[in-house]
Amino acid sequence: MFGPSARLDVEVELGFVVGTTVPRGRSVAARDADRYVFGVVLVNDWSARDIQSFEYRPLGPFLGKSFATSVSPWVVPLAALERWRVDGPVQDPKPADYLHVDEPRGLDVRLSLAVNGSVLSNLSSAGLYWSMAQQLAHLTVNGAGVRAGDLFASGTISGPEPGTEGSLMEKYAGQRWLADGDTVTITGWCGDRERGPWLSLGHVDGTVVSHGALVSQEGGAE
C-alpha cells in the first residue's frame, strides 16, 4: 500500500500573509479585509495525485498534500500592487453581504510555470473567482480568528485557454507527471516587463528528490 508517488504534480497559487491579527470571536467583512492583509507570495502546493484521488472519499485530500509546500522568499506588500487591481469575474449568484466588495477585488499577477527551464504555462490571477479579501472574510465569519503571519493560498490558478494551466494534471490530462530530479520554477510579476511599468514578485523553485535522498539529507532513518 505504501510507496513513492507516481503522479507528483504542482499547483501554481498566489498566497497572502495576514498582517494584523483578528482575535477569536471577531469577524472581518470583505470590504474591510484588505486592512488585515500585509502582502502576497508565490506558492507551489505540491500534490501527489494518486494519493489525493484515493483520499478524496470520504474526507478529502490530506497526505496527498501535507508533504510539501514551497513559498517565494519575500512578501510583496499589498500597497505596492494597488495599480494592478482588477474587477475579477462577475459573481453570479451575488455573494452574501459579508463577502460583498464595491472596489476592484482582484489582482492581475502574471505567472509562469516552468519545469527544468522550459516554460509550460503563462497565466494570471486576474481570473480568480474569489479574492483574498473574500477568503479572509469567510475564514473569520464563524469567529475562528487569524494571527499576524498566517499564510493562506488561493488554490490552483488556471486560465480558460490552452497554455494557461496551473498544474500538470490540467495541462496533460494525466499523461505526464514530475520525476526525481525535475526542477519546478514559478515566476510572478505585475505589469509589462518589456515596456513597463512592472513589479517583480520573484520566483519559487523546488527540485524533486527521492525519499531515500531526502532521509539522507535530513539525517533520519529509513
Region spans (language model):
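Glycine-enriched loop-and-adjacent helix/strand subsegments that border the catalytic/binding cleft
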Residues: M1-H138, R176, T207-L214
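Active-site pocket scaffolds in enzymes
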Residues: W130-A137, G145-T207, S216-E222
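Structured DNA-binding interfaces in DNA transaction proteins
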Residues: V141
